[in-house]
Amino acid sequence: MTNDVEMKSETEELPPFPTVHILQVVKDAQQQHGLRHGDYARYRKYCAAKLERMRKALKFTNSHNCQKKRKAKFVKKWLSVESVQNVQFLNFGIFESERRYAEAMIDKITLEDNPEKSRKKFSMINSLRKAVLHATNLEKIVQESERFDAPTKLEAQAYAAWMRGMCSFESRNWQKASESLKLAKTVYEKLAEATNNTTLSSIFKGRCREIQPQLRLCEFNIAESPGAVGTMTELMELRMQMGEGGDSSVDKLISEMRASATSAEVVTIEWGGAKSTVDDEKAKQVVQEWKQTEVELAQCQTPKEKMALFEKATADTRDAIDRISDIIRRKSSENADTTVLQSIKAYLEFLKMNGTASRYLAIIDNTKSEKKSKPQDLLRLYDSVIEIYKEVAEIPGADHDKNLIQAFEVKVEYYRAFRCFYMASSYSALHKYSEAAALFDRTVSRVQDAEGKLKKLKSSSFITNETQSSLNELRSEVESAKVTVRAARLASAAGDVKTDSELAKIIDKRPLLETVNEWRQWDVRNSLKDKKTIPVASLPPAFIPMPNKPIFFDLANFHLTMPNVDDRLEKLQKDRDATPKKAAKGSSAAAASSKTSNQEEEEQQGLTGMLSGWKKSFWGNK
């Protein structure tokens, strides 16, 4: 009894742990170690290295069970309530779970890039199950220990529920995923309301926003029919909320719904003056997708959402065109009729071109909304739009529809006015005011032409984005720009505005030694204020090319023929014979001279042989 009383008193005397904000620990680690850019591999390595460091520092290492005549068996040391001596021990459960979650996301990304690697799906599910195991163990330890406060227990419960929900979500167990995600969202919402810390509140609310799209997708799949919870429009909104890095299951569900919708009905198109029935399932889905895209565009709030819609639709259209081309090639080899298929292919080409041009227009709207947009950027985009609309008339069968040809001629003239305006703005930015004024005048004439053609085809179904109000706005912008250009021209003529050459003189940083023959202006006072020195010479001096000695020095000198001096030698010999003393002296001198001449000949032959050897080694024997 006394021992029990002593143990109880010891446990009661243990101080409580401070509050552990699990989600904040996770978010800080993710933002600092790879997940800011979606690099799960880097994050996994960080979690593994941190676990190894903590096990060594806290002396909580794993062990190996050694047995005779057998390989040592790895025994993992699990976290328990008794082993938690301080708050740092909770990091074992957190980062073990995060490491497994990062491994699962790596497998998921690999599976999305390579759908044929089906084994990666099993690896992903296994990693998520291990992550759930560690998160559940963490929750159990925190709940059973009396040293942790209520916020820590709630965070552990929410984290484990979120991890279970993600595992069920990837396993397509929609019911369990919905229950777990709802629990996690409820707990995080309560924590956000209870805390006074704005940083923690924003983190909790951010996790709730992350859970919401996945929760809606679970509810959508749980319903017996899609209409019970939401329609196709709701699914598209859900995909926009999840963004580009969202789950691929939304796209799969959308394609499945479109496939089921198109398989039951007959899809007909009108192209080249004739109606054709689309039998291919992929082409059916693409035609229905473009119809649905027109409805979804009205719900888009930003140009980026429109860009994503057009990009997805054009990619699917390219795949359908490739499929139809393969069918045409196969039937042509069998001498079968391909007229209907050619018409369908031409119609898909028209959809692709029109969608690509619309995507460029969405990019233009997005570029205009940015602060650092330049007229040159918009000029290139308008060039692309005009070229695409010109190519529409060259599609086979397009000449049978006069309304289509006239409508796209109006489109070309309409966007030429905008291109001319931004070309004039580009010249104005380069201080070429005369050219800019002429182009602004041409813009006015193009606007008038576009207005006249637009009024004639106002009721055409092909003209949707081109409006009279946009032309009126362009006209007002042109008028204000013309006034600005005229004022700039007058200022430059009066000398108030510095030309490019004058600016170049001030900005010129060449040293004075290189510009001795030039007259240069230099503002000495401002240079002294800015502590700028006048460059006199560039140090160190630049390298200049210099001629070097050739590898074969003077080979031509060895081929010179010297004059014959035998007659002089005979005369010299006779003189020596006539005078004995002089001859003796002369003979010794001659012997010395002959000896030196022989040495010179030997040295000359040795040098010639060496150089001839070099010559043979470079060019070979002739």
From Swiss-Prot:
Highest taxon in the source lineage: Eukaryota
Gene3D superfamilies in UniProt: Signal recognition particle, SRP68 subunit, RNA-binding domain (1.10.3450.40)
Any Pfam family the entry gives: SRP68
Entry protein name: Signal recognition particle subunit SRP68
GO cellular component labels: endoplasmic reticulum; nucleolus; signal recognition particle, endoplasmic reticulum targeting
Role, per record: Component of the signal recognition particle (SRP) complex, a ribonucleoprotein complex that mediates the cotranslational targeting of secretory and membrane proteins to the endoplasmic reticulum (ER). The SRP complex interacts with the signal sequence in nascent secretory and membrane proteins and directs them to the membrane of the ER. The SRP complex targets the ribosome-nascent chain complex to the SRP receptor (SR), which is anchored in the ER, where SR compaction and GTPase rearrangement drive cotranslational protein translocation into the ER.
Self-association and partners: Heterodimer with srpa-72. Srpa-68/srpa-72 heterodimer formation is stabilized by the presence of 7SL RNA. Component of a signal recognition particle (SRP) complex that consists of a 7SL RNA molecule of 300 nucleotides and six protein subunits: srpa-72, srpa-68, SRP54, F37F2.2/SRP19, F25G6.8/SRP14 and ZK512.4/SRP9. Within the SRP complex, interacts (via C-terminus) with srpa-72 (via N-terminus).
GO molecular function, one term: endoplasmic reticulum signal peptide binding
Subcellular location: Cytoplasm; Nucleus, Nucleolus; Endoplasmic reticulum
Bias (Low complexity) ranges: 585-595
Species of origin: Caenorhabditis elegans
Comment text on domains: The N-terminus is required for RNA-binding.
Keywords from the named record: Cytoplasm, Endoplasmic reticulum, Nucleus, Ribonucleoprotein, RNA-binding, Signal recognition particle
Gene label: srpa-68
GO BP, sorted A to Z: SRP-dependent cotranslational protein targeting to membrane
InterPro entries registered for this protein in UniProt: SRP68, SRP68-RBD, SRP68_N_sf
Signal peptide positions on this chain: none
Region span, Disordered: 576-622
Record bears the keyword S-adenosyl-L-methionine: no
CDD domains linked to this entry: SRP68-RBD
